[in-house]
């Protein structure tokens, strides 16, 4: 699977502190209109050969050249509709109200030592941190969260913790919740602390008894903690198996609708497909109906303020994202990319991918840049699948030399793609120079050259009918998946300078980057291999595995690959959460892109094939505001 110049925002962001003007004087957010008379109408491609009944067609161009193309469904999101989005929550009054609520919640954190006792202070600290994180407002309280977790960690032990600092016995709920939150904040906590509860609480699995809500919440927090696993942590594998079985058994017996909804959400999305924006929208919906069930450790008045802030913050960010989506849409239309019918038009989906994990208003360049580069990689993907091998070799030469004159004799729409691609890479380099204090264009270009080489190798395999081993395929596929090239420049655009040494810990050849690319390739192949085979692209993880294991079938291959994905995601957890020199904001945004990919490929190819799930995600995240 393979995975922008535009006009400035119409107005400043809302609120003097919550969101600041971010777009002005930024090359990513300006464009020069393209003057190409030959592209004032769609490029004509007349179908003269019957389509394959599944996903393949042959077309004959006006020049008399026959090509094979995938019958990709059209863009689901009309660009005129995107331009009409109202951005209702950009008014300053909303930002001012949000700032007041942020102060109130900050006061809640500061008052924790006054309102908690030695019998419940630990669970109160953890519950408040957990609530602001689930509601998607934790970025406003990073100092307060650190203070709260430092306090909890002071009393952490190998035997776990109880509700309060003077508790004589550890309890499952506080220990499991503490383990999860502390690990996610890079505190050193061992999974062995949970072993006692996996053994002790086995009797909860008695499905003949009416489930106790407190017990269910305990097991739910143990399940959530078990998902933050590192390689070799068998206790977490056991805990996951135990808790999943238990929760599925008791789910039909739960009378509390909101608790039932939370369990269903966690079972369905787990950790690696649960992106921050989706989690926030889901918990806002759940809390909005009744907050009293969620935690006995936080006063309902506090929950009312948390919920109001979460709703307001979600809608304010959504208005910003609508502006960014309009910027992306204008770039798309005015660059003429929308007129290239052979390729997938998925710029909206790619923006969703970036925006569900990267929420900070000041990181517009990250979100828009990622969406632009990803859309262009998809064009290259479809182009390499469509065009004659000799044409592709010329196009590849032009990219590796960054010289448009080389493609003078190629079709006009290849020139369109090259120009848009070249401009996007240069614009992102200008943006990165502001934060890095140096020119990173050559560095980025070299990454693209390596990527193009990997793509050429796959084109050669397709042209010659060569079937590589799984090892050979994955070694090349980690590069051709495109993850590195679409994340590198957006990460460099973040407001954290990265030295060469630090860059090596997050970019190639780091294990972190390798795992991001590998899991993308593996998950993409398990969802797309049948459709690609219908288009004549038979080389995939599945077919390579079957070649290596004569007598095996698709089910065998998928079982092996899904197990491999699970293990590599555990290793990715470790690489993400281990202590190193990489700023967490850089690693975190890259990690969330991985989670976004896992989400959009959760059940099927959420990019190539029409998916009501993806359409609903886009509506809930970026179009439908939350009633306040």
Curated annotation (Swiss-Prot):
It is found in: Plastid, Chloroplast. Mg(2+) 1 binds at residues 381, 385. GO terms for molecular function: magnesium ion binding; terpene synthase activity. Disulfide bonds: none annotated. Gene3D superfamilies: Farnesyl Diphosphate Synthase, Terpene synthase, N-terminal domain. Mg(2+) 3 binds at residue 532. It holds the Pfam family Terpene_synth_C. Its EC number is 4.2.3.-. GO terms for cellular component: chloroplast. Pathway: Secondary metabolite biosynthesis; terpenoid biosynthesis. The keyword Secreted does not apply. It catalyses: (2E)-geranyl diphosphate = alpha-pinene + diphosphate. Its main location: plastid. SUPFAM superfamilies: Terpenoid cyclases/Protein prenyltransferases (SSF48239), Terpenoid synthases (SSF48576). Keywords: Chloroplast, Lyase, Magnesium, Metal-binding, Plastid, Transit peptide. Residues 1-46 form a transit peptide. A motif (DDXXD motif) lies at residues 381-385. Its cofactor is Mg(2+); Mn(2+). It comes from the Eukaryota. GO terms for biological process: alpha-pinene biosynthetic process; diterpenoid biosynthetic process; green leaf volatile biosynthetic process; monoterpenoid biosynthetic process. Binds 3 Mg(2+) or Mn(2+) ions per subunit. Monoterpene synthase involved in the biosynthesis of volatile compounds. Mediates the conversion of (2E)-geranyl diphosphate (GPP) into alpha-pinene. Belongs to the terpene synthase family. Tpsa subfamily. The Asp-Asp-Xaa-Xaa-Asp/Glu (DDXXD/E) motif is important for the catalytic activity, presumably through binding to Mg(2+). PANTHER family: OS04G0344100 PROTEIN-RELATED. This is Alpha pinene synthase, chloroplastic. The lineage of its organism: Eukaryota, Viridiplantae, Streptophyta, Embryophyta, Tracheophyta. The gene is Pin.
